[in-house]
Amino acid sequence: MIELKNLSFSYENSSEAKGQLRGIDLHVKKGELVILSGRSGCGKTTLTRILNGLCPGFYPGKLEGGYSLDGEDALKMPIHRLGTMVGSVFQDPRSQFFATNTTDEIVLGMENIPLERPVMQERLNTVCKQMNIERLIDRRIFPLSSGEKQLIAIASVCAMEPKVIVLDEPSANLDSEAARCPIG
């Protein structure tokens, strides 16, 4: 499903080792869960940005090596196509919200795929039930707690049903109960 071969990346105008990846080899099979851990600045976020196409597209730098997704060269995929295959939740969910209402935010990605309204409604209902967040439906996003915003961001990605879900610090804003299993 995901294959990284001798993948290296360094940010443009960066002479520091921080934010650089060198010689990463990784093979992730369908259905497999991989957790990357390491000290701050070791490249975890950079790797997530490569997986979802933000590096080098929006974060310029030098990218070498190979990255394939489902046997296709992900480095040659248009960003919009990669975006339908790789769903991302960032460290700070506020940085990825485009709507002001929770329901609108959860369905936004599905509208852009695009999916038919009945399919979107079914996925919305399913994800909210699985994640036990029905109480957050049809609410304004900005007054929500950081943890509730994190759950909305995760629900939005899950509702799109991408082949790969990349979570960067997924439990950072969640309490211990919600962090145990935000996807039910």
Region annotations inferred by a language model:
Residues 161:
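Conserved catalytic motifs of ABC-family nucleotide-binding domains
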Residues 118-136:
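Conserved ABC ATPase "signature" region
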Residues 140-144, 148:
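Conserved ABC ATPase signature
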Residues 165-168:
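Catalytic Walker B motif of ABC-type/P-loop ATPase nucleotide-binding domains
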Residues 37-39:
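The feature captures the beta-strand-to-loop junction immediately N-terminal to the Walker
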Residues 1-4, 9-23, 55-60, 76-78:
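A short, flexible loop at the N-terminus of ABC-type nucleotide-binding domains that lies
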Residues 66-81:
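ABC ATPase NBD Q-loop/coupling interface
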